[in-house]
């Protein structure tokens, strides 16, 4: 009996262990059931947008249902398409990296895809061209505002003329590489960007240069015509040398440490033509002077220089022009601009190498861009980097190299353990920032200019902010993380706007893992404000304006943090004319975290109209249960003038961005504008003595529906001074035709200037922003008032 009991007990124990094992396997399957988007595309988390596009295209051609007979091909392709749609978008990628797929639940992405032929022939047409930079929404502004000269091709993947242009654009890019930046924008992927630039047909080619409006190219789309169009915008000076200016021109350049590249044109042999000379002057601008001499008219001078036939020669500073046997003088046999350019660059002196003894002094008094090397480093010795001194001269930035083997302790103190580039701001060795982007000429130029003029520094254990220090914004990041790299330029912009108020620093978590663990950093980038003992994590988009909004919100909170008690007193017992919006959330909930910056932004937009609060359902779980909150985030609106007071409306919209939430909330505000009929329009607007602003709309018009809440805000903003009315042009078509309304919505001002009858057409207002419209019409009414007062004085 005892044996049987033990056997039964043993069997029961085995069964329990088996069940537990199966439960654990099931839980593991649930945890890992979501496919990793990076794995689906076969890319690393450090992949660039170009690499993501290339990987997706390769998979699309292989797995597309048009070519793949797998019964499940459609669903499989939807998965990789979803992965691509998320990872190509900077904001969605950041959310995915931080919260996983749950952070994307509100996003309607990846529901469809294009045909196989689209991916084969139309998708990413410039991704394999190194000379052409494909610019996305997040890269465009930085590129055209960098100070560099850009020629950009705005195209659409389905446009046949765009595909016809592609081979020519590639040839043009190769020929002009180094003279200007060649870009391409896919308007199929970046519709809003192209619309903001006024692009409504394809292809559209524009020159962008700092200090001038974009210039559109209208000519024939041939390489020669494109080159001829671009050349005048390239800064280049070619000097014709002759007996009257030869000596002074040479001596002035040599005294400044600049050499001369001179092509001598004689009756025999070949010299460089005009366009080649101009290209070389552009390529070598600031490094070498470019000139030419006509030996047919300057025969004596050419004889003195022992020039007997056409030749192209580089004379370094200090060289003797008549001593051409000198090894420093370089004779060039090529007639190709790029070949000559490379030879001359190789002949120029290398960047200055800084000694350990002089480093501290140099960094204390001057701005520097330094290449940190470990012995011989081919990358820092690239001839093209000699141009950095020219590009950074206007910012008073010097360029040099420091070999960490010459003083390992210095590099160790800076936490530099591998070759890198750093910008020092002229305030000592601790005020620096390390470059984490591509080590290419124009990327380094942009980084150096941004960094030395901003107030972001690299942090480590010795200078990490403590509790008793100033307010700091610290960006915890990893260099391999693309959203992290995209955030850095935005931090620099924000640091300039908040200089003297908040200090900015970055901490590399791949180097300072202990510090990052101490602050519970689990995703990159994580941006935190340390305000003495208070810590606030930023959860917005990677742009300076939203960072500034976040800081302003910390100073002047737009959202009330509610407790069960304050919910009762402020929301439940609100005044009859008061409205509240409340977000019921849990701190661990990914969609809740993604909502928070949008929630705060919405609160600022409706400040003074609707009160906004939030309540932590993890902290007050019993209260949320009593309020029947069953999921997070739960957004509720408690309206005005409704009994009982616990009545609310629940937001069920798909999009949780600030604009969508704002528009939804404003629908519940009591209407401040008047609906006008033809009769009331004539009686009150045309023949009345009030100032009116009118919105002419059609009910079926999407932009009209979006503008409606904005117009209601306007009506409240000008209440008491200007009356606001709406005219339904579907119901009153004749009235709108008589007022020459050609599109919807149309905003018109009808000011009263003392005459018996107003103009039927009013004054057009070309804006859909309530604040801007209010400013425009207020100024106009004040101007009319001043004219009337002046007229009355004259009458007296």
UniProtKB/Swiss-Prot annotation:
It comes from the Eukaryota. Disulfide bonds join 159-162, 481-484, 589-592, 701-704. Keywords: Disulfide bond, Endoplasmic reticulum, Glycoprotein, Oxidoreductase, Redox-active center, Repeat, Signal. A motif (Prevents secretion from ER) lies at residues 793-796. The keyword Glycosyltransferase does not apply. Its EC number is 1.8.4.-. Residues 349-464 are annotated as: Trxb 2. CDD domains: DnaJ, PDI_a_ERdj5_C, PDI_a_ERdj5_N. This is DnaJ homolog subfamily C member 10. It comes from Xenopus laevis. The lineage of its organism: Eukaryota, Metazoa, Chordata, Craniata, Vertebrata.
